[in-house]
Amino acid sequence: ESCTGGLIAATVTDIAGSSAWFDRGFIVYTPESKMELLGVQPETLNRCGVVSEPVAREMAVGALAHSNATIAVAVTGVAGPAGGTEKTPVGTVCFGFAVKTPQAVCAESSEQHFVGNRCQVREEAVKFSLKTLIALLS
């Protein structure tokens, strides 16, 4: 998690019994932490920008590589109120989803644009993450 700052992990661990299926979370707020903890490639960050689908995919794949999980979600975005650009305005959030099978790791990504203040953008990012995870598990 980047712009959500651990809110996804906090939300799922609010559920009693979540220790049976939740392994760990990574808060990687800076580009350096994304590289150090999740193995995001510097070239990807330089070429695509920190808020991008390729970075989100690499984050999700890295989360699987550094955990016992079989499914991972990654979030990187601009929650606001500052920090937006013309290319990535406030409310832009990129998601990476990775699933580990015995044969391979499959990853996909999505870019969403949420409207609202910082708290609302983060909450919408959590909702989108969890809805997508549920769909992937169904």
PLM region descriptions:
Residues 2-138:
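Short alpha-helical segments enriched in small residues
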